[in-house]
Amino acid sequence: MTRNATRILIAPDKFKGSLSAREIAENIAAGLREILPNEKIDIVPMADGGEGTADVICDALEGSWVTCKAHDPLGREIDGRYAYIENKKLAIMEMSEAAGMRRVQPDERNVDLASTFGVGEMLLEAVGHGAHEIIIGLGGSATNDGGFGVGRALGFRFLEGDEELAGAVAELERLTRIELPGDVEALATASAYSKDRRLTQPPLQLDLPRIIAAADVRNPLLGQNGATRVFGPQKGATKDKIDLLERALTKLADVVSKDLGVDYRDEPGAGAAGGLGFGLMSFCGAEIRSGFDVVIEAVDLISKMKDVDFVITGEGSLDRQTLEGKTPAGVARLAHQLGKRVFAVVGRASKDRQVREIFDEVYVTSRLGMSEKESTVRVAELLRERARELAQSL
Protein backbone atom coordinates (compact mmCIF):
# COMPACT_ATOMS: atom_id res chain seq x y z
CA MET A 1 0.00 0.00 0.00
CA THR A 2 1.47 3.33 -1.03
CA ARG A 3 1.44 6.16 1.47
CA ASN A 4 0.02 9.52 0.58
CA ALA A 5 2.54 12.21 -0.25
CA THR A 6 3.34 14.62 2.55
CA ARG A 7 1.99 18.10 1.82
CA ILE A 8 4.30 20.96 2.69
CA LEU A 9 3.43 24.66 2.59
CA ILE A 10 6.25 27.22 2.27
CA ALA A 11 5.14 30.73 3.26
CA PRO A 12 8.12 33.04 3.94
CA ASP A 13 8.66 36.78 3.81
CA LYS A 14 11.55 38.33 1.87
CA PHE A 15 15.13 38.49 3.16
CA LYS A 16 15.51 42.27 3.15
CA GLY A 17 18.25 43.47 0.79
CA SER A 18 18.66 39.98 -0.63
CA LEU A 19 15.95 37.76 -2.11
CA SER A 20 12.21 38.25 -2.59
CA ALA A 21 9.67 36.11 -0.75
CA ARG A 22 9.11 34.01 -3.88
CA GLU A 23 12.86 33.48 -4.37
CA ILE A 24 13.20 32.44 -0.72
CA ALA A 25 10.34 29.96 -1.06
CA GLU A 26 11.66 28.51 -4.32
CA ASN A 27 15.13 27.91 -2.87
CA ILE A 28 13.69 26.22 0.21
CA ALA A 29 11.52 24.06 -2.05
CA ALA A 30 14.55 23.12 -4.17
CA GLY A 31 16.44 21.95 -1.07
CA LEU A 32 13.48 19.93 0.19
CA ARG A 33 13.01 18.19 -3.16
CA GLU A 34 16.60 16.92 -3.10
CA ILE A 35 15.68 14.82 -0.05
CA LEU A 36 11.91 14.49 -0.49
CA PRO A 37 11.37 14.24 -4.26
CA ASN A 38 7.88 12.75 -4.06
CA GLU A 39 6.23 15.10 -1.58
CA LYS A 40 3.75 17.81 -2.58
CA ILE A 41 5.14 21.30 -1.99
CA ASP A 42 3.02 24.45 -2.22
CA ILE A 43 4.58 27.93 -2.31
CA VAL A 44 2.79 31.01 -0.96
CA PRO A 45 5.09 34.07 -0.81
CA MET A 46 4.14 36.34 2.10
CA ALA A 47 4.51 39.90 3.39
CA ASP A 48 3.35 41.89 6.40
CA GLY A 49 2.56 45.32 5.00
CA GLY A 50 6.20 46.29 4.56
CA GLU A 51 8.16 46.35 1.32
CA GLY A 52 7.25 43.44 -0.93
CA THR A 53 3.53 43.52 -0.06
CA ALA A 54 2.42 44.74 -3.48
CA ASP A 55 4.54 42.10 -5.23
CA VAL A 56 3.09 39.30 -3.10
CA ILE A 57 -0.55 40.29 -3.60
CA CYS A 58 -0.06 41.03 -7.31
CA ASP A 59 1.55 37.61 -7.75
CA ALA A 60 -1.23 35.80 -5.87
CA LEU A 61 -4.08 37.56 -7.67
CA GLU A 62 -2.43 37.60 -11.10
CA GLY A 63 -2.51 41.37 -11.35
CA SER A 64 -0.58 43.74 -13.57
CA TRP A 65 1.65 46.73 -12.89
CA VAL A 66 0.72 50.34 -13.58
CA THR A 67 3.43 53.00 -13.88
CA CYS A 68 2.88 56.60 -12.89
CA LYS A 69 4.75 59.82 -12.28
CA ALA A 70 5.26 60.88 -8.69
CA HIS A 71 7.84 62.63 -6.52
CA ASP A 72 10.35 61.12 -4.14
CA PRO A 73 10.81 62.25 -0.50
CA LEU A 74 12.97 65.19 -1.61
CA GLY A 75 10.69 66.35 -4.43
CA ARG A 76 12.44 64.78 -7.42
CA GLU A 77 10.25 63.31 -10.15
CA ILE A 78 10.26 59.52 -10.32
CA ASP A 79 8.53 56.74 -12.20
CA GLY A 80 6.52 54.88 -9.60
CA ARG A 81 4.42 51.77 -9.94
CA TYR A 82 1.56 50.01 -8.22
CA ALA A 83 -0.23 46.71 -8.77
CA TYR A 84 -3.75 46.59 -10.16
CA ILE A 85 -6.26 43.74 -10.10
CA GLU A 86 -8.69 44.58 -12.89
CA ASN A 87 -11.51 42.20 -11.95
CA LYS A 88 -11.55 43.52 -8.39
CA LYS A 89 -10.81 47.18 -9.24
CA LEU A 90 -8.15 46.85 -6.54
CA ALA A 91 -4.90 48.83 -6.41
CA ILE A 92 -2.03 47.72 -4.19
CA MET A 93 0.83 50.09 -3.56
CA GLU A 94 3.65 50.67 -1.11
CA MET A 95 4.39 54.05 0.41
CA SER A 96 8.10 53.27 0.02
CA GLU A 97 7.68 53.39 -3.76
CA ALA A 98 7.47 57.18 -3.51
CA ALA A 99 8.68 57.98 0.01
CA GLY A 100 10.95 55.10 0.99
CA MET A 101 14.50 54.97 2.29
CA ARG A 102 15.50 53.31 -0.97
CA ARG A 103 14.72 56.58 -2.77
CA VAL A 104 17.39 58.55 -0.88
CA GLN A 105 21.12 58.06 -0.44
CA PRO A 106 22.43 57.79 3.14
CA ASP A 107 23.91 61.29 2.96
CA GLU A 108 20.56 62.69 1.72
CA ARG A 109 18.46 61.54 4.66
CA ASN A 110 16.63 64.49 6.16
CA VAL A 111 13.42 63.77 8.02
CA ASP A 112 12.61 67.48 8.25
CA LEU A 113 12.45 67.85 4.45
CA ALA A 114 11.34 64.32 3.49
CA SER A 115 7.71 64.36 2.37
CA THR A 116 4.94 61.87 1.63
CA PHE A 117 3.59 64.15 -1.14
CA GLY A 118 4.43 61.49 -3.74
CA VAL A 119 2.33 58.93 -1.86
CA GLY A 120 -0.66 61.22 -2.23
CA GLU A 121 0.08 61.54 -5.93
CA MET A 122 0.08 57.77 -6.30
CA LEU A 123 -3.23 57.48 -4.44
CA LEU A 124 -4.77 59.97 -6.85
CA GLU A 125 -3.32 58.11 -9.84
CA ALA A 126 -4.96 54.89 -8.62
CA VAL A 127 -8.30 56.66 -8.16
CA GLY A 128 -8.02 58.04 -11.68
CA HIS A 129 -7.26 54.54 -12.94
CA GLY A 130 -10.61 53.36 -11.60
CA ALA A 131 -9.70 51.72 -8.29
CA HIS A 132 -12.64 51.00 -5.98
CA GLU A 133 -10.30 49.90 -3.20
CA ILE A 134 -6.67 50.71 -2.44
CA ILE A 135 -4.32 48.77 -0.20
CA ILE A 136 -1.21 50.70 0.78
CA GLY A 137 1.70 49.06 2.58
CA LEU A 138 3.30 51.17 5.30
CA GLY A 139 6.94 50.18 5.55
CA GLY A 140 10.45 51.27 4.62
CA SER A 141 9.70 54.99 4.98
CA ALA A 142 12.22 57.83 4.80
CA THR A 143 9.65 60.27 6.17
CA ASN A 144 8.36 61.47 9.51
CA ASP A 145 5.73 63.98 8.41
CA GLY A 146 2.55 62.48 9.86
CA GLY A 147 1.03 62.39 6.38
CA PHE A 148 1.47 66.17 5.96
CA GLY A 149 2.67 65.58 2.39
CA VAL A 150 -0.24 63.29 1.53
CA GLY A 151 -2.67 65.89 2.81
CA ARG A 152 -1.06 68.58 0.65
CA ALA A 153 -1.17 66.34 -2.43
CA LEU A 154 -4.88 65.77 -1.85
CA GLY A 155 -5.49 69.52 -1.71
CA PHE A 156 -5.75 70.19 2.02
CA ARG A 157 -4.27 73.59 2.88
CA PHE A 158 -2.08 73.86 5.97
CA LEU A 159 -1.95 77.45 7.16
CA GLU A 160 -0.42 79.79 9.70
CA GLY A 161 -3.01 82.53 9.60
CA ASP A 162 -3.39 83.16 5.86
CA GLU A 163 0.09 81.91 4.94
CA GLU A 164 0.30 78.40 3.50
CA LEU A 165 3.06 76.17 4.85
CA ALA A 166 5.46 75.03 2.13
CA GLY A 167 6.08 71.43 3.19
CA ALA A 168 8.95 71.14 5.71
CA VAL A 169 7.85 69.16 8.76
CA ALA A 170 9.29 71.71 11.21
CA GLU A 171 6.86 74.29 9.81
CA LEU A 172 4.01 72.37 11.44
CA GLU A 173 4.95 73.99 14.75
CA ARG A 174 3.45 77.18 13.25
CA LEU A 175 0.28 75.47 12.00
CA THR A 176 -2.91 77.21 13.12
CA ARG A 177 -5.58 75.84 10.77
CA ILE A 178 -6.32 73.32 8.02
CA GLU A 179 -8.68 73.97 5.12
CA LEU A 180 -10.46 71.15 3.30
CA PRO A 181 -9.63 70.63 -0.38
CA GLY A 182 -11.50 72.94 -2.75
CA ASP A 183 -15.21 72.28 -2.43
CA VAL A 184 -15.89 70.20 0.65
CA GLU A 185 -14.13 66.82 0.44
CA ALA A 186 -13.02 67.36 -3.16
CA LEU A 187 -9.82 65.82 -4.44
CA ALA A 188 -7.41 66.31 -7.31
CA THR A 189 -7.65 63.88 -10.18
CA ALA A 190 -4.20 64.96 -11.29
CA SER A 191 -1.66 66.47 -8.94
CA ALA A 192 0.57 69.40 -9.79
CA TYR A 193 3.89 70.06 -8.18
CA SER A 194 5.84 73.30 -8.35
CA LYS A 195 9.39 74.13 -7.37
CA ASP A 196 8.27 75.47 -4.01
CA ARG A 197 6.49 72.13 -3.34
CA ARG A 198 2.96 73.54 -3.38
CA LEU A 199 -0.12 72.24 -5.12
CA THR A 200 -0.57 74.58 -8.09
CA GLN A 201 -3.89 73.38 -9.52
CA PRO A 202 -7.20 73.40 -7.67
CA PRO A 203 -8.56 69.95 -6.82
CA LEU A 204 -11.54 68.61 -8.75
CA GLN A 205 -14.58 66.82 -7.36
CA LEU A 206 -13.77 63.16 -6.67
CA ASP A 207 -14.76 60.71 -3.95
CA LEU A 208 -12.11 58.48 -2.43
CA PRO A 209 -12.57 54.73 -2.56
CA ARG A 210 -12.00 52.51 0.45
CA ILE A 211 -8.35 52.74 1.56
CA ILE A 212 -6.72 50.08 3.73
CA ALA A 213 -3.37 50.95 5.28
CA ALA A 214 -1.45 47.73 5.93
CA ALA A 215 0.95 48.22 8.85
CA ASP A 216 3.51 45.89 10.39
CA VAL A 217 3.80 47.98 13.58
CA ARG A 218 1.20 49.16 16.12
CA ASN A 219 2.92 52.29 17.42
CA PRO A 220 0.86 55.42 18.16
CA LEU A 221 1.77 58.75 16.57
CA LEU A 222 3.34 60.41 19.63
CA GLY A 223 5.23 59.68 22.82
CA GLN A 224 8.00 57.29 23.81
CA ASN A 225 6.55 54.54 21.61
CA GLY A 226 5.55 56.91 18.83
CA ALA A 227 6.74 57.39 15.27
CA THR A 228 9.46 59.94 15.98
CA ARG A 229 11.13 58.55 19.09
CA VAL A 230 11.11 54.91 17.97
CA PHE A 231 11.86 55.22 14.26
CA GLY A 232 13.30 58.73 13.85
CA PRO A 233 16.88 57.74 14.75
CA GLN A 234 16.84 55.07 12.00
CA LYS A 235 16.13 57.88 9.52
CA GLY A 236 18.99 60.08 10.69
CA ALA A 237 17.18 62.24 13.25
CA THR A 238 19.38 63.62 16.04
CA LYS A 239 18.13 64.17 19.61
CA ASP A 240 17.40 67.86 18.94
CA LYS A 241 15.65 67.02 15.68
CA ILE A 242 13.56 64.34 17.40
CA ASP A 243 12.27 66.86 19.95
CA LEU A 244 11.41 69.30 17.15
CA LEU A 245 9.61 66.64 15.09
CA GLU A 246 7.65 65.48 18.13
CA ARG A 247 6.43 69.03 18.73
CA ALA A 248 5.56 69.40 15.04
CA LEU A 249 3.49 66.21 14.92
CA THR A 250 1.80 67.10 18.20
CA LYS A 251 0.72 70.40 16.66
CA LEU A 252 -0.49 68.61 13.53
CA ALA A 253 -2.61 66.22 15.61
CA ASP A 254 -4.04 69.11 17.65
CA VAL A 255 -5.06 71.12 14.58
CA VAL A 256 -6.44 68.05 12.78
CA SER A 257 -8.61 67.40 15.84
CA LYS A 258 -9.77 71.04 15.95
CA ASP A 259 -10.47 71.55 12.24
CA LEU A 260 -11.28 68.07 10.90
CA GLY A 261 -13.02 66.73 14.00
CA VAL A 262 -11.05 63.47 14.18
CA ASP A 263 -8.23 62.41 16.49
CA TYR A 264 -6.33 59.25 15.61
CA ARG A 265 -3.05 60.04 17.38
CA ASP A 266 -3.40 57.14 19.84
CA GLU A 267 -4.69 54.55 17.37
CA PRO A 268 -2.49 51.45 16.97
CA GLY A 269 -0.57 51.91 13.72
CA ALA A 270 -0.94 55.70 13.66
CA GLY A 271 2.84 55.95 14.00
CA ALA A 272 3.56 53.55 11.13
CA ALA A 273 5.72 54.94 8.31
CA GLY A 274 6.64 58.13 10.15
CA GLY A 275 3.06 58.85 11.13
CA LEU A 276 1.62 58.19 7.68
CA GLY A 277 -0.90 55.87 9.35
CA PHE A 278 -2.24 58.91 11.21
CA GLY A 279 -2.32 60.98 8.03
CA LEU A 280 -4.16 58.38 5.98
CA MET A 281 -6.80 57.96 8.67
CA SER A 282 -7.16 61.73 9.11
CA PHE A 283 -7.12 62.89 5.47
CA CYS A 284 -8.42 59.81 3.62
CA GLY A 285 -10.64 58.02 6.12
CA ALA A 286 -8.34 55.02 5.79
CA GLU A 287 -8.65 51.89 7.89
CA ILE A 288 -5.43 50.71 9.57
CA ARG A 289 -5.09 46.94 9.61
CA SER A 290 -2.41 44.42 10.41
CA GLY A 291 -0.41 44.01 7.23
CA PHE A 292 -0.16 40.28 7.81
CA ASP A 293 -3.95 39.97 8.12
CA VAL A 294 -4.43 41.94 4.90
CA VAL A 295 -2.02 39.66 3.04
CA ILE A 296 -3.37 36.34 4.36
CA GLU A 297 -6.83 37.34 3.15
CA ALA A 298 -5.54 38.40 -0.26
CA VAL A 299 -3.53 35.20 -0.83
CA ASP A 300 -6.14 32.95 0.86
CA LEU A 301 -3.52 31.47 3.19
CA ILE A 302 -5.93 29.83 5.64
CA SER A 303 -7.57 27.58 3.05
CA LYS A 304 -4.17 26.71 1.58
CA MET A 305 -2.84 25.76 5.02
CA LYS A 306 -5.77 23.60 6.12
CA ASP A 307 -4.83 20.47 4.18
CA VAL A 308 -1.03 20.48 4.58
CA ASP A 309 1.01 18.38 6.99
CA PHE A 310 3.48 21.05 8.03
CA VAL A 311 4.46 24.63 7.29
CA ILE A 312 7.77 26.42 6.66
CA THR A 313 8.13 30.17 7.04
CA GLY A 314 11.03 32.58 7.39
CA GLU A 315 12.50 36.07 7.09
CA GLY A 316 15.90 37.73 7.15
CA SER A 317 16.08 38.29 10.90
CA LEU A 318 14.20 36.47 13.65
CA ASP A 319 14.10 38.59 16.82
CA ARG A 320 11.76 40.26 19.31
CA GLN A 321 10.31 42.43 16.54
CA THR A 322 9.15 39.23 14.84
CA LEU A 323 6.51 38.85 17.53
CA GLU A 324 5.07 42.30 16.71
CA GLY A 325 3.08 41.49 13.60
CA LYS A 326 5.86 40.11 11.39
CA THR A 327 5.22 37.31 8.90
CA PRO A 328 6.92 34.33 10.63
CA ALA A 329 5.06 34.90 13.90
CA GLY A 330 1.77 35.31 12.07
CA VAL A 331 2.30 32.15 10.03
CA ALA A 332 3.32 30.24 13.18
CA ARG A 333 0.24 31.31 15.11
CA LEU A 334 -2.04 30.41 12.23
CA ALA A 335 -0.33 27.02 11.84
CA HIS A 336 -0.78 26.29 15.56
CA GLN A 337 -4.47 27.22 15.36
CA LEU A 338 -4.85 24.67 12.57
CA GLY A 339 -2.80 22.03 14.41
CA LYS A 340 0.17 22.10 12.03
CA ARG A 341 3.86 21.79 12.81
CA VAL A 342 5.77 24.90 11.74
CA PHE A 343 9.45 25.48 11.02
CA ALA A 344 11.40 28.67 10.35
CA VAL A 345 14.32 29.16 7.97
CA VAL A 346 15.92 32.53 8.66
CA GLY A 347 19.04 34.55 7.95
CA ARG A 348 19.80 35.35 11.59
CA ALA A 349 18.05 34.39 14.82
CA SER A 350 17.94 35.73 18.34
CA LYS A 351 18.56 33.27 21.15
CA ASP A 352 15.45 34.66 22.85
CA ARG A 353 13.41 31.67 23.99
CA GLN A 354 10.10 33.50 23.56
CA VAL A 355 10.91 34.10 19.90
CA ARG A 356 12.09 30.58 19.13
CA GLU A 357 9.46 28.62 21.05
CA ILE A 358 6.68 29.48 18.60
CA PHE A 359 8.41 27.22 16.04
CA ASP A 360 9.04 23.48 16.16
CA GLU A 361 12.59 24.22 14.96
CA VAL A 362 14.54 27.19 13.65
CA TYR A 363 17.15 26.81 10.88
CA VAL A 364 19.62 29.66 10.44
CA THR A 365 21.42 30.25 7.15
CA SER A 366 24.34 32.26 8.55
CA ARG A 367 27.07 30.40 10.38
CA LEU A 368 29.51 31.36 13.13
CA GLY A 369 32.40 33.28 11.58
CA MET A 370 30.51 33.99 8.36
CA SER A 371 30.40 37.69 7.46
CA GLU A 372 27.12 39.37 6.63
CA LYS A 373 28.37 39.96 3.08
CA GLU A 374 29.20 36.28 2.59
CA SER A 375 25.87 35.11 4.00
CA THR A 376 24.05 37.54 1.68
CA VAL A 377 25.99 36.49 -1.41
CA ARG A 378 25.49 32.79 -0.65
CA VAL A 379 21.91 33.06 0.62
CA ALA A 380 20.31 30.91 -2.12
CA GLU A 381 22.84 28.11 -1.57
CA LEU A 382 22.48 28.37 2.22
CA LEU A 383 18.69 28.25 2.02
CA ARG A 384 18.84 25.01 0.05
CA GLU A 385 21.37 23.61 2.52
CA ARG A 386 19.16 24.38 5.55
CA ALA A 387 16.13 23.00 3.71
CA ARG A 388 17.98 19.72 3.17
CA GLU A 389 18.73 19.57 6.90
CA LEU A 390 15.08 20.21 7.68
CA ALA A 391 13.94 17.50 5.26
CA GLN A 392 16.34 14.96 6.78
CA SER A 393 14.92 15.64 10.25
CA LEU A 394 11.37 14.77 9.25
For every predicted segment, state its role:
Residues 2-138, 142-394:
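N-terminal loops that bind phosphate or other acidic moieties
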